[in-house]
Amino acid sequence: DIVIAERGGALKAPVAVKVHSGEVGNQNFIKLEFFAPTIEASGGIVTECNTAYDGGRNTTARHIKTLKKHGWSEFFDVDLLDAEGPDLELEIPDGKVIKKNYVGKNIVNYDSLLVLSHFKGHPMGGYGGALKQLSIGVASSFGKAYIHGAGVPEEIWTSDHDSFLESM
């Protein structure tokens, strides 16, 4: 109710509710119970994208297991936006470093995007939060590598740090 009341009306359905579902073994994510009332009030579908690094969310199969382990798919419908390709390429004509981004193609199935995020220190980006959720968060696995690599996905961990930040 808080989100809808603050906005002054309902979000246009269908609503994608972008969350960080949490990495396996990591406690630094907001738990489902905290977000549940807002998700229910929005009437939305929980959405996520696969990661570009090894772990419990780097493939669709592993990510589905993580979503189940953390309770997301038990209580809500979940859509992995990049579960199946091809990625959706979005142009960024005024981008300082990159001129396009690759996002999960299922994002076109939604008329509204509600971003639920936490604020944290991030080893590469300085701070993570809502803006990071809108760039890297909705990027496909390839898109995440593309952003981290400042347009060269193969340089995901070796690109110039400032170029990475400007890409995000």
What are these regions (language model features)?
Residues 1-168:
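N-terminal and secondary-structure boundary signal
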